[in-house]
Amino acid sequence: MSGDVVVFAASSLTDAFKELASEFQKAHPSARAVFSFGGSSQLAIQLINGARADVFASADQDQMDVVQRGRGLAGGQQVFVRNRLMVIAPRDNPAGITSLQDLAKPGIKVVSAQASVPIGYYTAQLLKSASGHADFGGDFQRRVERNVVSREDTVRQIVAKIQLGEADAAVVYVTDVTPRIADQFVRISLPEDLQVTATYPIAVGNGRNPAGGEAFVAFVESPPAQAILARWGFLPPTDGA
């Protein structure tokens, strides 16, 4: 197996997959992983409109299913990691955000994602669940959404908005605040009974290097690669893994 392996991957996988690429090349010296990172929904649209990728790694099941229905996959798909959510605020935290409830306070500037983007879907799921709890109130989701000042196309864009102080708070993946930038944020955990688990499926695409795609998917599922993903904060594909 040799040549470029084109990998379309969710933006939340950027740092982990870049590290994986180095290890993948050590295992396959004649191959090279070439990445296109972006919002899973954007990547799915590209794939069903004719873009060629040897691997597609999505941040949610729906976008993978879209590509499968559009005949953009060469084989089956499987979940390879999971993720969780948290609230972040800028380091100086001018709005005094300390909990999920604070996102509904009048005047709070919240940045979120488009509804078609996985983090947007997961955030809506979280807010809907919270609205069913007496501590939050039945109109909690509506009050938070009223505070949304910007909807981004990727979770990395959301993180950048908070990092630049352009908004007071956002819901992102736990893995998005990497060690390199951790000191620039306040991180706030979610109540465990409201926590949303994001599942990430991966599959071989209809690219020009199917052998390379199969090799990359197999590597991502291997124990060494799973250990790298865990170091970046991702959870194993199942609770028992």
What are these regions (language model features)?
Residues R84:
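Short beta-strand->alpha-helix junction loop in the catalytic core
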Residues M1-H28, R32-F37, S41, I45-N49, ...:
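Exported/periplasmic ABC-transporter solute-binding proteins
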Residues G72:
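Active-site surface patch of divalent metal-dependent phosphodiester/phosphate bond hydrolases
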